[in-house]
Amino acid sequence: MAFTPFPPRQPTASARLPLTLMTLDDWALATITGTDSEKYMQGQVTADVSQMTEDQHLLAAHCDAKGKMWSNLRLFRDGDGFAWIERRSVRESQLTELKKYAVFSKVTIAPDDERVLLGVAGFQARAALANLFSELPSKEKQVIREGATTLLWFEHPAERFLIVTDEATANTLTDKLRGEAELNNSQQWLALNIEAGFPVIDAANSGQFIPQATNLQALGGISFKKGCYTGQEMVARAKFRGANKRALWLLAGSASRLPEAGEDLELKMGENWRRTGTVLAAVKLEDGQVVVQVVMNNDMEPDSIFRVRDDMNTLHIEPLPYSLEE
């Protein structure tokens, strides 16, 4: 990517975030084009893409035959096909899996590094962008296209925008916002995704979890009414037979080091500590607080106390901005 990422700053929680423009270099874009693209994606992901309108973007999972996610995808219609955003660390392996059956269909599946991914969030983000685009996405119309640019709207943890655009427009946007917005890298967007309860699947956790273990059913990412797709049987069984015992949790507190993706944590049991869960992502905020996204048993007590392994500091459960009740 010729567009240079912005230098890192310590991320800030959404409630205190000043207007911020971010380069999303830890995320990556991919596309599917061709006459069979809708039919092909319908047979590969958990969401009902045939029902998707031009105005929507969806979180969907791409699973293996056992229902374990290669990755989750932020999916939207793009040209005559679809584009999606996923973690850069999983894109190559995810595309390899997605292409396995493509020889039988009129589709082209490819990474897209020509376009640039930017995030805009924080204080009066909408007002700042309103000067630069003729229309902005909203709850009713979550995707807007203008020239070479696609804008995606997110409600949680506070209103924010993801911009998919060409290098020239990215440079223009940066020049226009540079004076009023702080610049940051993708760690800030990661912190917002953790706060929003959007699961982050990096390479360490690819192929490890069924979608429901990361709350995808609560985020509208699974259709239980659509036709066959890879892994569907296991995903359906988890719902209808109650086979899923895990959920995605948000923890906050202190830690002397950041746990890495794939690492476990420790749960306080009386005087002892027991290993539990799998970390998906963690970020240290500018106020010193550590936020951790972790997959654990779905019956954790709300007052449970956790820690990074062998650490002196502790973490506690924070509420997510959505309900897991079905």
Swiss-Prot record:
Its primary localisation, in coarse terms, equals cytoplasm
What's a Pfam family this protein contains?
Answer: YgfZ_barrel
The molecular function terms in GO held by this entry are: folic acid binding
Q: Does the keyword tRNA processing apply?
A: yes
Biological processes annotated in GO: iron-sulfur cluster assembly; RNA modification; tRNA processing
* Annotated compartments: Cytoplasm
Q: Does the keyword tRNA processing apply?
A: yes
Q: Which GO terms describe its cellular component?
A: cytoplasm
- UniProt keyword list: Cytoplasm, Folate-binding, tRNA processing
Which residues of the sequence carry a binding annotation for folate? Answer: W27, W189
As for family, the record states: Belongs to the tRNA-modifying YgfZ family.
Protein function: Folate-binding protein involved in regulating the level of ATP-DnaA and in the modification of some tRNAs. It is probably a key factor in regulatory networks that act via tRNA modification, such as initiation of chromosomal replication.
> NCBIfam families in the record, alphabetically?
PRK09559.1, ygfZ_signature
Q: What is this protein called?
A: tRNA-modifying protein YgfZ
Query: What high-level taxonomic lineage is stated for the organism?
Result: Bacteria, Pseudomonadati, Pseudomonadota, Gammaproteobacteria, Enterobacterales
